[in-house]
Amino acid sequence: MVDRLEPILPGSYLGILGGGQLGRMFIQEAINYDVHISVLDPAADAPCAPYAHSFTQGSFDDFDTVYAFGKNQDVLTIEIEHVNVEALEKLKSEGVKVYPDPAILRIVKDKGLQKQFYAEHQIPTAPFYLIDSKEDIERFVGDFPV
């Protein structure tokens, strides 16, 4: 399901979904290597914009926008988890290296799935209930401190 991380080769095209402060710090380090860095972000004045080799203004949660941006990259990564996972899955199936893997992003984006993953893999986490209905709230209300 999840591939091992492969090296990013010199001359590669690296795309980043999200152009905030973390992306800016990433670019400031990555710029020392022979990679072409592109950023997709909805804000024209995103912190990454002045540092990237190319900047595309657009929505990173829109399938068509992410797909069009990603098909020109060798490697895609994220700066924010609120991205279109379906587009990343398609790009991965077409040979684009996507990190983190879209399957991992699905878990990270859904905090309920994330908590279930922790529990299934014995990763310490705070106690939790998955609440899907009013009845669930009524059933678990006595277990909450307030």
Question: Where are the model-predicted features located?
Answer:
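ATP-binding N-terminal substructure of ATP-dependent carboxylate-amine bond-forming enzymes
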Residues: M1-I104, V108-K109, L113, E135
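Active-site nucleotide/adenylate-binding loops and adjacent lid/helix of ATP-dependent enzymes
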Residues: I107-V146
